[in-house]
A protein has these predicted regions:
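Fe(II)/2-oxoglutarate oxygenase catalytic core
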Residues: 1-102, 110-166
């Protein structure tokens, strides 16, 4: 698959440049094709997608797949708006993707990012994530055993709703 081959090449370069050690429990999430259009609801601050990280902080202690690196390939650039904007350590970094660009960045804090509104046309992109399998913290697993899986899941959902601003 050409898209996966492009991701592999860019990720290997990124990993070498940033001296990242590949872990045996890392894997790809799988590609998802998406688009933003000028028909998407525009929020008050002119962002189509609000600032966020792809790592879900509220689920950090739970077992399961977690986001490590965000990888986005841009298919076209014949649209107006749609810049990706990073808010990193208090600085705003704006990038207008060009067709063929692949952006790779850590999925967690401090790499908050959002997408500006499309004013004309459609923006097509392919998203993929490098994920890792996390067994869960000892505390989380102990509580699941102590309270039972069903009750603990309900308690965690309450905590997530309280802790996660999304």
């Amino acid at each position: 698959d050409q898209i996966q081959a492009a991701y592999d090449a860019v990720l290997l370069d990124y990993i070498k440049r940033h001296d990242i050690e590949l872990k045996p429990n890392w894997h790809f999430s799988g590609c998802s094709f998406s688009k933003y259009t000028d028909q998407v609801d525009v929020l008050d601050n002119k962002m189509t997608m609000q600032y966020h990280t792809d790592f879900i902080i509220s689920e950090r202690d739970m077992p399961g797949s977690k986001f490590q690196l965000t990888c986005t390939m841009y298919i076209n650039d014949n649209y107006d708006g749609g810049d990706i904007e990073f808010f990193v350590n208090g600085d705003i970094i704006n990038h207008k993707p060009q067709a063929g660009d692949i952006l790779v960045f850590p999925s967690d804090d401090p790499y908050f990012h959002g997408v500006k509104t499309i004013y004309n046309g459609e923006k097509f992109f392919v998203r993929n994530f490098v994920m890792y399998t996390f067994p869960g913290t000892k505390e989380w697993l102990d509580n699941q055993l102590k309270f039972g899986a069903y009750r603990w899941a309900k308690e965690e959902l309450k905590r997530i709703e309280h802790d996660d601003p999304r």
